[in-house]
Amino acid sequence: MADASVRVEDKLFYNRYLVDSGRAHIKVRPHTEPPPALLSMLKLCPARCYELNEAGQVEVTVDGCVECGTCRVIAEPSGDIEWTYPRGGFGVLFKFG
């Protein structure tokens, strides 16, 4: 039986990422007050790519994104983010096992 005490963060550590510098596949729409969809991403993103900066705005760091699509479903329909697939060969490289 699998060890139930293994955290998601520990499993994500084994994945590798090929960052496409200067071409983020997720862009947050500029805002002064974070909309509800972006605030929900602070808790819902499994890779914890969304954070509040010191000005109280939501920022995204795509370097650790697992491309699960959660933010695409929650924040893209409202226009709070722009989500595109990473260019071929870039993004998450999953390690199975």
Swiss-Prot record:
It holds the Pfam family Fer4_ETF_QO. Gene3D superfamilies: 3.30.70.20. The keyword Zinc does not apply. GO terms for biological process: nitrogen fixation. Keywords: Electron transport, Iron, Iron-sulfur, Metal-binding, Nitrogen fixation, Transport. GO terms for molecular function: iron ion binding; iron-sulfur cluster binding. SUPFAM superfamilies: 4Fe-4S ferredoxins. Residues 56-86 form the 4Fe-4S ferredoxin-type domain. To ferredoxins from P.putida and C.tartarivorum, ferredoxin I from A.vinelandii, ferredoxin II from D.desulfuricans. Could be a 3Fe-4S cluster-containing protein. PANTHER family: FERREDOXIN-LIKE, FERREDOXIN-LIKE PROTEIN YDIT. This is Ferredoxin-like protein. The lineage of its organism: Bacteria, Pseudomonadati, Pseudomonadota, Alphaproteobacteria, Hyphomicrobiales. The gene is fixX.
